[in-house]
């Protein structure tokens, strides 16, 4: 029934004379696995929200305004059932000078913990929890610490295990 409902909802605004043809063709394609439907569409298309985005990329810059805006965007997209990609490679590394050395940067780990918490705070309509992959360039100042963030050794202070990571070469 799910595939028929998805097909009907997708084409509900099409002209009546063509709608049933499109519904049947789409149903045939998805029910025989000729095409695959992403989870957000499968889980949410039949709800009033109708989220079509499967994944989004949130690009965070180095300023606090950008980091906190990125965190807000992450929360909103997770609540809309989207998988999250986070480009966090421009966030300065631990000990970097801020305002001419007046302050030293806390590094990426505290901000990753914030992103992790935001991703985990919303379930996607009870179907699954939120998920995110964080992207870093291989030349990032903290790359050695980033590479072991999911490692089972270490303490919760220096691990962020519930995010996934990719390294950009």
Protein language model regions, located:
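Extended catalytic cores of very large enzyme megasubunits
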Residues: 1-169
